[in-house]
């Protein structure tokens, strides 16, 4: 079986094997990962000597067999996990891993820098299934929906939720619906 036949069988239709390539003009360096390593609690290496640079306009895929560290690398890049060693720079600024005992507060700090994270399994890791759509829109943005006394401002929460539901065409348009019922 040729590569082309195998690819056609995988997608269920003939595919174009040669795609026209646009000129490659890499932009400024956006993300630089240098010698990132991660060990588990027993000292077993989960990531070893990870090095790469991402430039503006590039699309990079991190691929591998399940269990080979892709998820762990993305968790490091989004501040959800600390590397054992190494350095990560975003827009020329070193990300603040050093001197920390844990990753508490890093995801919020990274969001302020413009770094986001879309989990592999959004129902397992991205939402609380038994909470409403509106309640789930608060997570990670608590400081933006509080009133002057530091309490949640439910009008702001409802406005934020309505805006997100409209922007992403969430159906049915019911902010009180349990998010675990959505597809």
What are the residue ranges of the model-derived segments?
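Glycine-rich phosphate-binding loops of nucleotide-dependent enzymes
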Residues: 1-183
